[in-house]
Amino acid sequence: KERIITGSGSGSGSGSGSGTGTGSGKDAGYTPTMQRALPWILAILAGLVLALAMPGPGIWPLVVVFPVLLLEALDRTRTWWHAWLLGWLAGTVHWLAATSWVYDVMHHYGGLAAPAASAVLLGMALYLGIIWALIAGVVFLVPSVWRIWFFPVAWVAIDTLRRFQPYQFPWNDLAATVAHQPVALASLPVWGATGLGWALVAVGAGLWGWLRRDRRHVSAVQLIAAIGLTISMSALSPGFESAGAPVRVALLQPGTTLEEKWNPGEFEEIADRVWSLTRRAADAGAKVVLWPESAVPFRIDTDETYRRIVTELAIDLDIQIILNSIGGSSGNAFANSAYLVTTEGISPVRYDKVHLVPFGEYVPPWAEMVTTGALVREVGRFTPGQSATLLPSIVPLGESICYEVVYPGHSAAAVKNGAEILITLTNDGWYGHSWAPDQHFAQVRLRAAESRRWFARAALTGISGFVDPYGRVPERLEVGGQGFLIADLTPIRTVTPRARWGDWWFVLCAIGAVGLLIWTRVRPVSPLKEA
C-alpha cells in the first residue's frame, strides 16, 4: 500500500454543608431496597458510559452523560465513606471496560494464566479507581448546589494527577473522546486537552443541574460559561508560521507481529521487509524515512553489521532514517532510544525515552511478583532520558517513543526547545485489534492540535498516519496493514500558549477547587439558595 499526500501547512443535609439528603420527592415510588441500590447502579453506569465514550467504541456524546450519573449517585448518599466507595466503584468499572485489552496483553503476550491476567486487570482498575474515589469524596464535602461548579474543577485537579507518581498513567483523558472532531480541538492551542476536558465535564454537570428544576439558574450559568469559554479559546487560538520549505517524510508500517519479532528464524525476513519499504519510499521522493519502534530485531549500538547496512542504505538512497533501538546507558543499564542516520553516518545526538511504560519498560517495586520475562524484556534495566532532545534532521524533530505521547508536557517541551515537526515511533502490536490502538492514536491528534505542529506517527502494526496542525488526519494505515505513507510536512515555528505557559488551566482548576472547597466549608449559608 503506497500513498502520497500533500499537506500545507438542596438538600444540602447537615449544617456543615457536607451532606446531601435524598429528598422524598425524587425517590417517590422507589422501595427502600431500590433507594439503597440506585446510587450503586448509577455509579456503575457512570463508569461504563465514559468507557464507551472513549476511542474504540467512540460513542463520544456519552462523555457529558457520565457527570450526570455520577453526580446523581453522590446526591443520593448521606456519608462521605459511602460517596468515596461510589466513586471507587465507578472508576473501577470504567477502567475494567476502557482498558480491558490489558488482559490480552498479559495473557497472550505476557505468559500469565487467565486467572492471573484477570487479577492484574482488576488490580489495575482498582488502583486507578482510587482517583475517582478521591474526586467523589472531595465533591461530597461541598453542598449539593455548589457541585455543579465544583465537580469540573475537582475532576481536572485530581484526575490530572495520573500524570505523576505513583500513577504515571495519563491514558484516556476526557478530550480523547472528541479527538476525531477537529472543530472540538480548535481551542487546544490555548488551554490544551485539560481545558477541553474541563469544558466537557462542565457541560455534563450543567445538564445534571438542568434536570433539577430548583437549580436551573445555576446550571444555565455553568453551561453558558463552558460553551462560551470554549468558543473564546478557539477564537484566541493562533494559526501557524511556516519555518521553511515542506519536508517530504515517509512512514513505514512493516506489519510485523510480535510472534514474528520473537522468532529468530524470522529475523532476516523482517529486516528485508524494512529495507524494501525504505527503498520504495525513497523512490517515491521521501527525504526522511521513519521506522516504527522495534522495526528490526537488532541493536544499532552493538551490531556492527546492522550499523553498516543502515548507513549504506541512507547513503545509497540519499535519505535520512529515524529508527528506534535499545541504546546502552550508564553501567549495565539501557535506554529506549531514537537514532538519526544520515549520509554522513549515525548522528551522535540521540533521543532517550523520558517517560517509560509501567510494566513494559520498568516495573514498580510493589508489582514485581506479577511480571514475566516474556512481557518485559530487560526489565528493571531501562533508564529514562532526561530531556526532550531534538533530532537534528533536515529540520529539528521533536520525538516521542510510543507511550509517552500521552504526556502533553513532553510534546510542549519539544516545541519550546525548537521542534518544527513532531514524530513518534511506536509498537502497538501488543494491542491487537482491541480499543487500545484507537485510544493511543487519539493522543497524537490532541498533541498535534495543542502544539500547532504536523505530527508523524510510524507504528509497527498500525495505526500509522500524519496529523496536521489542526488535529485532522489526511490518511492513515489501519491496524494489520502493511506499506508506507508519504506527506510533505510544513515545518512550523509558532509556539502556542499551551506550549509556552504549560498546563495553566490545570493550575487554575486546582486553585479553584481548593478555593471553592474552603469557601463552602467556612461560609455558614450558601449565597445560592436551593428551593
Please report, for each region that a protein language model flagged, where it lies by residue.
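Extreme N-terminus of proteins, especially the signal/transit-peptide cleavage junction
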Residues: 28-35, 241-245
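Short amphipathic alpha-helical "recognition" segments used for binding
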Residues: 5-6, 29-31, 163, 297, ...
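Small-residue-biased low-complexity repeat regions
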Residues: 5-29
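Soluble catalytic domains of enzymes that build or remodel membrane lipids, polysaccharides, and related
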Residues: 237-501, 505
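Membrane-embedded alpha-helical bundles of multi-pass enzymes
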Residues: 30, 34-236, 432-433, 444-447, ...
